[in-house]
Amino acid sequence: SVDKDRSTTLLFTNGWAVEEQAKELRRAGLDSVFVSIDAADPQQHDEFRGTPGLHQRALRGIQRALSLGYSTGFSATMTPEAWQAGELQRIIELAKGVGVHEVFVFDAMPTGRYKARTDLVDNHDWLEEMIQSAAPYNRDDRYPGVTFLAYMSSHRSVGCSCGTSYFYLSPYGDMMSCDFNHAKFGNVLEEPLWQIWDRLSTLPEFCQAKWGGCKIKDAESRKLQTVSDGDRSCHDRDDQPAMTN
């Protein structure tokens, strides 16, 4: 089960309601807030998200979180083409200006709106160059730390430990091994969280980390129903609209 004294709770969000809810969430025990930034340019970000004004609200929300003492960050998803266009560098500069503590970089996964991007499966060639590009920022105290899921899930770190040392909880209470996995293992509105977590973390495919990259981007792992549960977005529910974090 989860030891509340040895675990942390992170919120990854599009940032729409953070400014209004940050104080209440702090009282509830939330430790960290990460807002998704898809582009440093507000218009480009809002067009991608389909929500006018979202970029501005996300920045206001993260500034509110900073004022309340949260650990804060940007989460950015990079496709190979966005990386080549210099978007990561622009987002890092924005993060420096805002004053967040970290930029967490996800390499685009073949799920959600990218579920048709089969070119992202078993494609690691561009990731090392992107990871190494952050070294100057990480040596400069003026910048936030820049971390990469691709590094963490590699043989140089802990490997892909989704469902092993962490899980994702959807806005509707569904527990998944991570926010990119379609498969649901239970709902906290229907049974205790610890019970679902124990069931998930003792499955053979999740009882230990997988070295060498993310399960969702691995062709062999994706054959498992517990890793790639159909074609629906990982946020879709039969009784709820799809959401994008």
Feature annotation, model-predicted:
Residues M175, D179-N245:
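Flexible mid-to-C-terminal extensions adjoining Fe-S/redox cofactors in radical SAM and related proteins
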Residues F12-N14, S75, D238, T244-N245:
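Structural motif
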Residues S1-I37:
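Conserved SAM/AdoMet-binding glycine-rich loop
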Residues E24, A28, S36-D38, Q43, ...:
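Radical SAM enzyme [4Fe-4S]-AdoMet core and its adjacent flexible, acidic
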Residues C160-T164, H182:
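Short, small/polar residue-rich loop motifs at catalytic or cofactor-binding pockets
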